[in-house]
Curated annotation (Swiss-Prot):
<feature type="region of interest" description="Domain I">
    <location>
        <begin position="1"/>
        <end position="62"/>
    </location>
</feature>
<dbReference type="InterPro" id="IPR010994">
    <property type="entry name" value="RuvA_2-like"/>
</dbReference>
<protein>
    <recommendedName>
        <fullName>Holliday junction branch migration complex subunit RuvA</fullName>
    </recommendedName>
</protein>
<keyword id="KW-0963">Cytoplasm</keyword>
<comment type="similarity">
    <text>Belongs to the RuvA family.</text>
</comment>
<dbReference type="InterPro" id="IPR003583">
    <property type="entry name" value="Hlx-hairpin-Hlx_DNA-bd_motif"/>
</dbReference>
<feature type="region of interest" description="Flexible linker">
    <location>
        <begin position="134"/>
        <end position="135"/>
    </location>
</feature>
<dbReference type="GO" id="GO:0005524">
    <property type="term" value="F:ATP binding"/>
</dbReference>
<keyword id="KW-0227">DNA damage</keyword>
<dbReference type="InterPro" id="IPR012340">
    <property type="entry name" value="NA-bd_OB-fold"/>
</dbReference>
<dbReference type="GO" id="GO:0048476">
    <property type="term" value="C:Holliday junction resolvase complex"/>
</dbReference>
<comment type="subunit">
    <text>Homotetramer. Forms an RuvA(8)-RuvB(12)-Holliday junction (HJ) complex. HJ DNA is sandwiched between 2 RuvA tetramers; dsDNA enters through RuvA and exits via RuvB. An RuvB hexamer assembles on each DNA strand where it exits the tetramer. Each RuvB hexamer is contacted by two RuvA subunits (via domain III) on 2 adjacent RuvB subunits; this complex drives branch migration. In the full resolvosome a probable DNA-RuvA(4)-RuvB(12)-RuvC(2) complex forms which resolves the HJ.</text>
</comment>
<dbReference type="GO" id="GO:0009379">
    <property type="term" value="C:Holliday junction helicase complex"/>
</dbReference>
<dbReference type="GO" id="GO:0009378">
    <property type="term" value="F:four-way junction helicase activity"/>
</dbReference>
<dbReference type="Pfam" id="PF07499">
    <property type="entry name" value="RuvA_C"/>
</dbReference>
<feature type="region of interest" description="Domain III">
    <location>
        <begin position="136"/>
        <end position="184"/>
    </location>
</feature>
<dbReference type="InterPro" id="IPR011114">
    <property type="entry name" value="RuvA_C"/>
</dbReference>
Amino acid sequence: MIVGLVGEVLKKEPTYLHIEVGGVVYEVFISLNASAAIDKKQIRLHTTHIIREDSESLYGFVDINEKKMFDRLIKLNGVGPKVAIAICSTFKPQEFVQIVQQKNVAMLKKVPGIGPKSAQRILVELGEFDISESNVTSSAFQEASMALQSLGFKKEQIQKALQECTATDTASLVKEALKKIQKL
């Protein structure tokens, strides 16, 4: 499984990009929100690797919460990667959480390919959907954030650096975030 890519963007279109990693070029499908967030040549993407009988696809995300949202959506009945990426393109993760919590069928119907019945079913199946990290990872992120704040870094810098981190324990998160903040 490919869970992340770090490399150079060779071609960028609104719904996909080509990224070169170690001499190999990957086609990675992205949401419109991710496309808008990618503004540099060197990038790090969280990915979901989908292997089917007749195809293999990579879906990339700048924001880990968008990846979680996508991963949760593709587990639902009748929601494939195309519909899931359309939802990710239409709503940012926090907006989607609110839509699910409010059971807002009208908003979900705005997504291309989702009608009233599909919207209702998705909202019922998601139930109490939340994109927050698991308790362990979430507390590690909170502790790392507090540690970095105590070192005098701004919340915006910390948030941006932590979103790009792959570590799950506090000490590793702080180390990785410090390296990323230095590059900002």
